[in-house]
A protein has these predicted regions:
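Intrinsically disordered, low-complexity polar regions and short flexible loop motifs
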Residues: 12
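Eukaryotic intrinsically disordered, low-complexity regions enriched in proline/serine/threonine/glycine
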Residues: 15-17
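All-alpha RGS (Regulator of G-protein Signaling) helical domain and cognate RGS-like helical scaffolds
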Residues: 2-9, 21-25, 31-196
Length: 196
């Protein structure tokens, strides 16, 4: 079992999750993510910084996709849990596809996915010895993604734009909740446990 989530987080991800990167998505980038292309184009403005932020988010989605793949291939997941893991992997593939399309619409180049073996090393897949280990890893990645998406909401001035970021965070929160339930963990004892 891996002791801390910080062991899994690469420096760029750590900055993105902690908010120390001091960057936020523009309204145009969030509109593109929401499929509002014409409205986004009318806003104009430079989007290079947004492409960088979206590429960090894309990297997080690649990591989640590959973590679920490693879990599925491990032989450690029992049938009902394996089905849920495959479903969650599909959700992350949907997030990936939306991010790639948005980055390309912005004229950017999406960061490329690494090889599965690279993710296995970063995520220390060789330490996964049980279904609980796989679920624990996935839960830690899901809470990291939740907090990352929640981190962009305060920078948005428009309620509709904040809604898009909140929907992504809600997806990740749902995954985290299901995984924690499967691990028979209690609900958080404090109010407002997400986004801190």
């Amino acid at each position: 079992m891996i002791d801390t989530a910080s062991e899994l987080i690469v420096p760029a991800r750590r900055a993105f999750l902690s908010g120390t990167s001091k960057v936020a998505l523009s309204a145009a980038a969030v509109l593109l993510l929401a499929g509002k292309d014409s409205l986004a184009q009318s806003m104009g403005g430079p989007m290079a910084a947004d492409v960088g932020i979206l590429n960090v988010a894309l990297g997080l989605e690649y990591e989640a996709i590959n973590a679920y793949q490693l879990g599925a291939q491990s032989g450690l997941l029992q049938k009902p849990v394996l089905d849920v893991a495959v479903k969650f992997q599909g959700d992350h593939k949907g997030h990936r596809d939306a991010l790639i399309a948005t980055i390309e619409k912005m004229g950017g180049k999406p960061v490329e996915e690494k090889k599965l073996d690279d993710y296995a090393k970063v995520l220390k897949a060789d330490t996964l010895k049980s279904q609980a280990d796989v679920l624990d890893l996935a839960a830690r990645l899901e809470i990291g993604a939740t907090n990352a998406y929640l981190g962009v909401i305060p920078t948005l001035k428009d309620a509709q734009l904040a809604k898009v970021a909140a929907r992504l965070a809600a997806d990740e929160t749902m995954h985290w909740t299901v995984l924690n339930s499967a691990l028979s963990r209690s609900l958080p004892s404090d109010a407002l446990p997400f986004g801190a």
